[in-house]
Amino acid sequence: IGYSVLEKPIYCLKIGTGPRQVFYSGAIHANEWICSNMLMKFVEELCIANNKNSSLFGYNIRNLLHKTSIYICPMVNPDGVDLLNGELNLNSNEYRYARYIANKYPNVPFPNGWKANINGVDLNLQFPAGWENAKKIKFSQGITSPAPRDFVGNKPLAEPEALALYNFTLTNKFELILA
């Protein structure tokens, strides 16, 4: 559906052919990377149940997938997840910049407390709905520049990950969105 700051693809899987649309997203915060694994396990279980024409949680999955299209974006913030899980090169400019940001917040463990994308922007606070209010709250708390968590950014949808997610939701008619 788009690319991260470091140009890593942000993938979305579609399972089902039905007109009703449901969307799941995971790892919008770097320290919520476990959600990606959980969503991929959910995909695996859906596919197995569909192939076997069996039930999952009391629902016949084949029937469900004829009525519903399930979209799953397992990892919205791949750069942040890579930072948190030690996949970024410690000598890279991106890692050094993240370390520089983190040093301003000694109470947030680095990298384990990192929620933001690689630019130090909290992607969950990047959407237009309520952005001005979130900015007011976070700025009053002293979070006015890139940070490991809670920086709203300089304007809504400034970060490519948030913009990709926003545009993707606009191009579909989701009845339910779970993040």
Named regions from a protein language model:
Residues 1-22:
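Soluble metallo-hydrolase cores and metallopeptidase-like ectodomains found primarily
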Residues 2, 14, 26, 74, ...:
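Pocket-edge structural micro-motifs
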Residues 19, 33-37, 41-179:
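Active-site/substrate-binding loop(s) of hydrolase catalytic cores
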Residues 24-26, 148:
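Acidic/histidine-rich, surface-exposed loop or edge segments in extracytoplasmic proteins
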Residues 29:
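Conserved phosphate/anionic-ligand binding catalytic regions in large, soluble enzymes, centered on
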